[in-house]
Amino acid sequence: MNAIDAVIDSFSRLPGIGHKSAARIAYHLLKQGPADALRLAEAVSTLHEKIHPCTICGSYTEDEICSICADETRDRATICVVGFPQDVNTISSIPEYRGLFHVLGGLIAPLEGIGPDQLHISELIRRIHEGGITEVILATNPTIEGDTTALYIQKILQDLPVNITRLASGLPVGGDLEYADRLTLARSLNGRIKF
């Protein structure tokens, strides 16, 4: 395998990048010159050295505590529970949410050998017991694994003095009804709100 094929193969192993996209990236790096390629290689090579989970929420950070957990202006009574660190970036990108986060580190997926004991659920319970939390928002993906995880956490937390909510799911803004699947339509109907 030559050098270009090796780079294409490496990029195509990344999620969401197929062979054609990987080839475009490889040829773009060649066209840009060695400085850009070196900058990318250095950034990737130091990723695991510099980035680690926040000791409070589990999101990725370069510091012991991430910038969200360290921000005293955030709503400390609300915790948004997500499956993965990248979900923190997605939700924190909207100004409507100013609370804290808790990363589970995955979702319950028995077929993949992932059960509740592999997730950071006990840490969530500890954070609630430490006090000050009044609402837990379950923001796991609207998939079988995400729903299973949310239901499990809801059952575990139901006797604790917190409100447990789940993100609404339904039709996307600008979406056409004819393209919606049956489950999405059912959830949209069941979760309808007064207008």
UniProtKB/Swiss-Prot annotation:
Belongs to the RecR family. GO terms for biological process: DNA recombination; DNA repair. SUPFAM superfamilies: Recombination protein RecR. Residues 77-172 form the Toprim domain. InterPro entries: DNA_Rcmb_RecR, Rcmb_RecR, Rcmb_RecR_Znf, TOPRIM_dom, TOPRIM_RecR. HAMAP family: RecR. Pfam families: RecR_C, RecR_HhH, RecR_ZnF, Toprim_4. PANTHER family: RECOMBINATION PROTEIN RECR. A zinc finger (C4-type) spans 54-69. The keyword Membrane does not apply. May play a role in DNA repair. It seems to be involved in an RecBC-independent recombinational process of DNA repair. It may act with RecF and RecO. This is Recombination protein RecR. The gene is recR. It comes from Treponema denticola (strain ATCC 35405 / DSM 14222 / CIP 103919 / JCM 8153 / KCTC 15104).
